[in-house]
Amino acid sequence: KNVILMIGDGMSLMHMYSAWTANRGKLWLDNSQYTGLSKTYCANRLITDSGAGGTALATGHKTNYHMVGVDPEGKPLESLTTLANKKGLSSGIAVTCRLWDATPADFCCHNTDRDAEAEIVADYVNCGVDYVFGGGSKLFENRADGRDLFKELREKGYQTPRSWEELAKIQKGKVFCVTDTVDTPLPAERGDLLARASMKAIDLLGQNPEGFFLMVEGSQLDDYGHFNDIDLLMQETHDFDRTIGRIFEWAAQDGETLVVVTADHETGGLTLVDGDLNEGRIVCKFSTGGHSGVMVPVYAFGPGAENFTGIFENTDIFWKIKKLLNL
């Protein structure tokens, strides 16, 4: 009935195992029932980015590096959020980055260049997604083209809270929450905002008896992989894992929800070279400040989880979810 796709941006098996070690052998992710491996290469490069990598997950098509929600020729592709809405299901996204960043845009927008930020943000007005939570308010208002996208969203029937406190009060209806709190660079300052925003999405989207599709992204794992900052990377990874835990617990009680956890690519070429499990100590090395081409893990929990075993293309995740939701 429901599918929640959780994307750890830049997350690899090594990220999760390092986090497991740092947490003295405990992760919520350990409760996954089935696991697989996903090939992340894109249409024109072995090493992908979040534009092409996320587009594969969102639409089932490999596209060119830096493209968002379009095929290699630039033709717009339908995403899982769009297909869910067409079938009468609700849809949503919750991320800890600016909404013009590639992964959220892959599910809602269409552009041949992920850096065309103002154009990408304008696409959200007509995307039809029922719940959006993320950051990046500056491109929704005070734009060079004079448009007030918050006003346009309200005219489309959205409520537009600008903080968690405002969002928490909403009990029903379509929501487009842009709060710059998600852009706080330090995970400790952001707190459990991703978990709260995700559970709020479930509360609102779950009111639809037909079901829902929700994408949740731990966005800033990627940032600290690029920065080769293992301490903040582990903080982000543990924040994402705690969000996974909240969602796994809810899904276990619900009984009709599949949760799939994966990544769009790996960032940093992370290697765990030493450590101590009892002390929660890790010694890691990075091989790059960019992305690497390794396969990324896929974890699944709930009804239909058995479909996510083995080695498969990243695009297969889309097709498996589409089939399970009968989209």
Q: Where in this protein do the model-derived segments appear?
A:
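N-terminal catalytic scaffold of extracellular/periplasmic and nuclease hydrolases
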Residues: 1-143, 149-167, 266-327
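Structural motif
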Residues: 5, 132, 177-179, 213-217, ...
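Metal-dependent active-site segment of extracytoplasmic phospho-/sulfohydrolases and closely related
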Residues: 13, 238-277
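Gly-rich Lys/Arg/Thr-decorated short loops/hinges at beta-loop-alpha junctions or inter-strand turns
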Residues: 57-65, 174-187, 222-227, 299-303
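Active-site His/acidic residue clusters
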Residues: 102-108, 181-184, 198-201, 207-246
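A Trp-anchored, charged/polar loop motif used as the substrate-binding/catalytic surface
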Residues: 159-163, 191-206
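Active-site lining segments that contact anionic ligands and/or coordinate catalytic metals
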Residues: 173, 209-213, 256, 265, ...
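Gly/Ser/Thr-rich active-site loops/lids in small-molecule metabolic enzymes
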Residues: 232-250, 279-292
